[in-house]
Amino acid sequence: MIEIESNKKKDYQSILTDDALNFLEKICLTFESSRQEILENREKMQQSISSGSKLSFPKDQKIRKDNWTVTPPPPDVANRNVEITGPVDRKMIINALNSGADVFMADFEDSTSPTWKNLMDGQVNLFDANNRKLEYVDPKNEKTYALNEDSNTSLFVRPRGLHLDDKNVLIDGKPVSGAFLDLSLIHI
């Protein structure tokens, strides 16, 4: 069962919907044990390296030597010569999407201080950007910022890393993965 303090949920009901939280619960039930295994293996590898072991390629030469390819990127992101990365605040998203860059990557990990307010406001901002309803009025000078109608910058999202938990959302009393939460809210 998912738990979120009611005072933390009430301001973000537009994104913390039943569908989003049900999706989060499914992701956690499906992938949490694998995530924990990955984190344990990462810790073991770090201990091994710290003890003097050298890195080496895994014994999967067949994959590296095989003749395989990946699907080409969609045409609208095939050219990524200019890419901006930044926090998920409204003004930054608007300016980045209006910049003419090929891609703006909204960054929930390194560019955003991980407070509940910043993270949830960021989710609201992405929802509004995807629906082309993102506006911001600067409280200092009352200047209004809005998405240009002709903006064609692609919006990418970098969720928090798999190693970061979100203590504000619990399943069975345990914090959920920040990455799982970010992806669940973006997905819906």
Predicted regions and their residues:
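Low-complexity, highly charged intrinsically disordered N-terminal segments
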Residues: Q13-K62
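Active-site mouth loops of central-metabolism enzymes
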Residues: A78-D89, D165-G178
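Conserved small/polar residues in nucleotide/adenosyl-binding loops
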Residues: I186-I188
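A short alpha/beta connector and helix-capping loop motif
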Residues: T112-P159
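Short acidic catalytic loops
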Residues: D102-T112
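Active-site beta-loop-alpha junctions enriched in small/polar residues
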Residues: P87-D89, E109, R158-L164
